[in-house]
Amino acid sequence: YANESVDYSKFADDVVFRGTLLGSPDSLNLDQIKGIHKEFFAKYDVKHMAPFNYLQGVNPQTGQADESVRMYYQMQVTNTTNGKSVVIPIYESFDFNEEGKAVFVQWYSDWTASIESIE
């Protein structure tokens, strides 16, 4: 993502994305995410602030480890038109199918306010 290059083959065709974007639908599909990425990368540069620390996910019903992954990270976003930057703390999780492709992706951050702060 930081290289403005997302390998969309890592996602199932029917993947569901859920995030915290003000005004966006409750869930987004892969084509919608591709469009959002295209617009975003046209205006912003991204830098991850540290290596990712992946954590084993847990099934909320059983309390047992499952095939999901969670992670916390910080991403610096720079508006290329004015040079302003913000560091956004993000929590993200991925659930995978038997083929190892992401079927559900969710993230939590104050994304909308953070991006607005660098406009």
Indicate where each model-derived feature is located.
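C-terminal and inter-domain tail/linker signature
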Residues: 1-119
